[in-house]
Amino acid sequence: MKTLAYDLHLHSCLSPCGDNDMTPANIAGMAKIIGLDLIALTDHNSCKNCPAVAIAARKYGLLFLPGMELTTAEEVHVLCYFASLDAAMDFDRYVSDHLPDTPNKPMFFGDQLIYNEQDQISCTEQRLLISATDLPFDAIYDLVNQYDGIMVPAHINK
């Protein structure tokens, strides 16, 4: 039996809690340096950096699981993992329609950077990603299943 070292709850520079140094290449490179075999990107309410992290992970010989840390209407954080990048990006588009139009304030929450496949900044997310969606917790399991994914509560204290 092969054992894997993994981190299934990583944020990039897209998440308001992330640092601008948490670029796709840096995430994958550091994961390789510390001996991880598998990483999952779970930015807050977005999968927009998953394509770039998937490419960076492949370059470093890492397995990659696309994901998202979804904030429900009740402000519960749920980790959502997907079998494919396409499914994750489809889910991202769905969730985007359920986020409030609260603008990000970079001075307080950071820049929310989106990277392209060449590990360069392509744009910034203008809406604040740590806001709660209007999606109720009770609907998330079935919703994530529709996108060939699984969900796991992110924190034991909420």
Residue ranges and their predicted role:
Residues 3, 56-158:
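Extended substrate/RNA-proximal surfaces in nucleic-acid metabolism proteins
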Residues 1-75:
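An N-terminally biased module of ancient metal coordination in phosphate/nucleic-acid-related enzymes
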